[in-house]
């Protein structure tokens, strides 16, 4: 550096390489790569924790409180949905399924009676759907 100052005093123009300090330019590439590896040794959680320091304490505490509240609400909603699903399912099984089964049973009985009537009285009686004991419809007019 002293040579650069002495040369500057002599009035000779200096190259930019002479003016810049010789820092990392003299290090071999292997040492530079090792320096990069040393910087990357921190984990993702450490990096994220380090990033929180760039926000003010007030913002960090507000974000933490918002996260805690969101977690609390999600847990409450999960518990409520489990209870509501249990109540809805058991109520459906107790109140609605017996009605559905009885309706199916009634339809099956009606279908069996219709089939018996077709077998005993002939194929046209099943289609008429008339009342029992009523006169059968005319064969040409349906």
Swiss-Prot record:
GO terms for cellular component: membrane; mitochondrial outer membrane; mitochondrial outer membrane translocase complex; mitochondrion; TOM complex. One of its GO terms (biological process) is protein targeting to mitochondrion. Residues 104-142 are mitochondrial intermembrane. InterPro entries: Tom22 (IPR005683). Residues 83-103 are annotated as: TMD. Residues 2-83 are cytoplasmic. Keywords: Acetylation, Membrane, Mitochondrion, Mitochondrion outer membrane, Phosphoprotein, Protein transport, Receptor, Translocation, Transmembrane, Transmembrane helix, Transport. This is Mitochondrial import receptor subunit TOM22 homolog. It comes from Homo sapiens.
